[in-house]
Amino acid sequence: GKIKALVGAFPMELSVLGQTLKVFGIGTVSVHPYSRGCGYMKQLMNMALGDMKEQGFHLSCLGGKRQRYEHFGYTPCGQKLSFTLNNENIKYRLNHYVNENLIFKGVTDDIEQAYELYNKAQFKVTREKSVFLDWLRSWDFNVYFVYECNHFIGYVVVNKENTYISELVVKNDEDYIRVLATYIHNNKADFVNFELPVWEKQKIKQLTQVAEDVTLHHAYQFNVLNYEEIIAQLLHFKASYADLIDGVLSFEVLDYGMFVISVENGEVTVSKFEGECDVLLSHIEAMQLFFSPFGQHLVDDELFNHLIHSWFPAPLFMPTQDKV
C-alpha cells in the first residue's frame, strides 16, 4: 500500500536532579496532499497519545502551529530567556572578556570530556554516549570544542550562519561569558542569538546588563500526561535554586483528575486528592498556570495568590538539540 500520512513518536528521558521523566517527542507530522481532509492526522495523533499513556509516559512535546495541536492537548508553555549579543555589546561592555588564549577547534578526541561535562547538568535530556556527537549535530549544526592553553574547557553548538548558539557547555559561569565574547569577536559576527533556562541565574544576571535584547518566551509546546510526577519533580528542582512558600493547594484538572500539592520547608509532595478542590482548570489552563510565564492571571484569589506566585511557573524547558 501507499503511505498516506506519518506521525513520528520519539521516546526520550528527561533527567531532573537524577530522577527520570519519560518524554515522547512528536515530529514528521505529515499528510499526502491528495489525502488531506480524510482524518489521517487526527487518527495517528490519537494513536500516538494512546500509546504514550499506555506506556506510562509523563510528558510529550512538539513544534508547530498552536491551534493545530491544542486539539490534541498540546499548548505553548515552559520558559526560556532569549538573548541577542552584538559586536557593539562586545566592544563596549564585554571586550575585557575576549581572550586570545581561547581556541575553537572542530571535534577532537576530547569527546569523552564533552560528554562528561554535559552530564554534570542537573536538568538534561539523557543522551547515549554512542550518539552524543550526532545529537550535537542535529539540525545541521556545527560543533566546536573550546580550549584554553591546550586544556579542554567546553564546547559550542552553532548554526551554519554563526547567528544562533543552541548549546554552550563550559566548566563554570566565568568561562561562559568569556567563550561567548571571544566567539563573537573571533567570527566578526554582527550578532548572535542564544537562550538560557530560568535557573541559570548568575548568567542571566550578567547578560541582562549588557545584551542588546532580552525576551521571555515559551520554551516549546508540551502536553502533560502525568501532572503529579511532572509537578513534583519540577518543583523539587525549583526548590534547589529558589525559596518556595509553605502551603497546600488542591487542583482539579478536567478530564484528568484531582491532586494536591504540599510544600513544607522546601519539601514538595504531590498526590491524588478526593474532595472539593481549591482550583478548577481545564487541561490547557492547567499547563499554562503551572508552566507558562504568563499563566498566573488564570487564578485570582487572595487566599491562593501568594502560593501560586511562589510555586509557579515550574521550570519546564527543552533544549534546541533535543527538540524533534
Question: What residues fall within each predicted segment?
Answer:
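Amide-forming acyltransferase catalytic core, primarily the GNAT-like/NAT-type
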Residues: P76, K80-K188, P197-K201, L225-I245, ...
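Conserved beta-strand in the GNAT
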Residues: K2-M12, V23-S30, F145, H151-K160, ...
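Active-site/acyl-donor-binding loops of N-acyltransferases
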Residues: Q67, T75-L94, T182-V324
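Conserved acetyl-CoA-binding loop-helix of GNAT-fold acetyltransferases
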Residues: V31, G37-G50, C61, N172-I184
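Hydrophobic or amphipathic alpha-helical targeting/insertion segments
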Residues: Q55, L59, G63, Q67-Y74
